[in-house]
C-alpha cells in the first residue's frame, strides 16, 4: 500500500504551553477547521476531543499527551496536545522527544509563565524548531507586543512577529499578515467567513514598521537577500517565507502569530504557518542510535531504510495495551515480528492503529515519519527501541526525572489486594515517573510520583478504571543519602554451626561518584583472591544495601565502590556469604565516608498582589526557602524561590488564606540538596525509631 502523503508533506507537531494558555482549545479548533470534528468542543464544558480521560474532562486540564492525525492543504498533520501542569512533565518530555516541531501557546494576558520556561527548556533539550501562537487576544489586558518582549527577555529567543492583531480585548476583529502584507477580517462568530482585505489605514504605519523589521531579520540570514534589501528596501512574500522557514529549521528564529482560539480567530493561519514553516521529518537531522558493536549510527527518514521506531508512551486500553510509536525509518507491517533492541526481546505486531483521540482507525502499515499505536506488544515500555531483527539499533531514549514524593497505599478491603497490584503494575507501565515499591520492614506498598496532583490523579484512576478503593497515607518526601568523603570498608561474614560453615570476606574502597551516576561498582580483584563466581553476589549485596540506605533508610546515590581485596574458604564460602559480606563492607564504608541526607528542592514561583509581598517572602523564609528573584508587573508581585519540598505540603491552602484567595503559585523539582544538620538529625532519629 502506497503512502497517503509524501514525507515532505507530513508534519509531526506538538502544542505545548503553561496551564490555561489555551492549548487544548487551540487543538480543538485545528480539528474543527481541518474537518476531523464537526462540532466545537470546549475544555470548560468537558467536551474536548483530546481530553479523553474522565479526570481531564472534570478538571479542565490535559494530563496525557493525546495523539491525533488530521490533514490541511494536502498535508498530513499529526498533533500531540501536551499537559501544562508540572506534575505531568514526563508527558511533555516524551512528546518533545518524538516531535519535529512545536507550536508554543502563550496567553496574551499572562505572557511567559514559569511552566512556559520549563516547556521551552524541554524543547531546547531536544532541539525542536518552534513557532509561537499568542492566544486569548480577546481577553481584557491582552498585549501581543508585551508577550513578544517577555519571550525575548526571559526565554532568550529570537522571536519575530509575522502577524499583528487588529484591535484587542473585546474589539479583536482580524489579523494583519506581515508576510503577505494584507489583512484578514473575521465576518462571523464561527471564524469560517474570512475576508482578505487591505491593511486598515490606522494600522498601516505600525504594520510597515514591523514588516521592515521582519525583512531586515530575514535579510541578515542570506547575503544575496541583504544586497537586494539594501538596494530596494523590499523582499517578496516568497523570499520572506523561505527565509522564515530556514530560520526556524536552524533554530535561529521563532515566528510569532496571534489570535483567539476560543473566539475562532487566527487558527486557520496557524495551520498555514505549520505547513509553511515547521519541518517535515526529512528536514530534521536523522535520528541517532548505537549499533550492537557500540558504534554510533543514524537512521534517515526514509521508507527504504531499515525499520526503526521509538515507543514513547504505553497506555492501558479496554482492548489491550496500546504502545504509541514514532516511526523514524522503514515500514512496520501488521503481523510482522520485530526486535525490542533495548531489552533484546522479539515482539509480534498484532494490530496497528492511527488515533483521533479516543477514536481509532486500523491500518496495515506505519511508515517513516508516522505517529501511531501498536496493539499486542508484551514487553515494550516507554523509551524502548523497536527495529528490524536483521539490522538492530538502539535509539536515543527519553530523559526520565526521578519522583520526589511518595505515599503509602493499601486496599480498603483484603479482597481488593490483587486488583490493587494489577492496577499499580498497569499504571507504572504507562508512566515511567510513577514508581511502586514495597517497604521491606512494614510490608506497605508505597507509590511515588512527581507531585501531589500526579498521585491524586493516579489514585483517582485506580478507582475509576480498575474499581479499586484505596486508603492513602500522608505524602512523604523522597529523601536520598550520599557520601561526601572517601574511605575503605571491610565485611567478613563467618559462621560455624556444625557441618558446613559460611565464609565470605571483601575489602572495598568507597568514594563519591559523578552526580547522577547512582551506584557504580568497579572490580579490581587480581590473581583470584576472590573467585569470579563470588564477585557478582558481593556486588549484589552492596547494591541492595545502597537501595535501602544506611543512615536513614533512603536510597544512597552517587557512590563508587571498588572491590580491591578479600579472601575465601574452599569449603565454607558461598554466594550468600559473599552477598552478606558485600553488604557489611558497604555499611562499614559509608559510616566512615561522612554520609549526609539529601532532600528535593523545589523551584517555586508565587504571584500575589503587591500588598502581600512582605508576608509571602517572610513565609517562604520560614519554610527554609531562599528567595532568588522578585519583581512587580502591573501591580502583581512575582517571587521566585527555592524551597525544600518537605516544607511545601499544604502550601496552596496557606497561600489562599494569606492572600484572601488572590495568590497563585507553581512548583517544580529543581535539584537534591543537603539537609541542614539539625533537620537531618530529627529525620534520622525518627526513622531509626528513637
UniProtKB/Swiss-Prot annotation:
The keyword Cytoplasm applies. CDD domains: EF-G (cd01886), EFG_III (cd16262), EFG_mtEFG1_IV (cd01434), EFG_mtEFG_C (cd03713), EFG_mtEFG_II (cd04088). Its main location: cytoplasm. Keywords: Cytoplasm, Elongation factor, GTP-binding, Nucleotide-binding, Protein biosynthesis. GO terms for biological process: ribosome disassembly. Gene3D superfamilies: 3.30.230.10, 3.30.70.240, Elongation Factor G (Translational Gtpase), domain 3, P-loop containing nucleotide triphosphate hydrolases, Translation factors. Pfam families: EFG_C, EFG_III, EFG_IV, GTP_EFTU, GTP_EFTU_D2. Catalyzes the GTP-dependent ribosomal translocation step during translation elongation. During this step, the ribosome changes from the pre-translocational (PRE) to the post-translocational (POST) state as the newly formed A-site-bound peptidyl-tRNA and P-site-bound deacylated tRNA move to the P and E sites, respectively. Catalyzes the coordinated movement of the two tRNA molecules, the mRNA and conformational changes in the ribosome. This is Elongation factor G. It comes from Parasynechococcus marenigrum (strain WH8102).
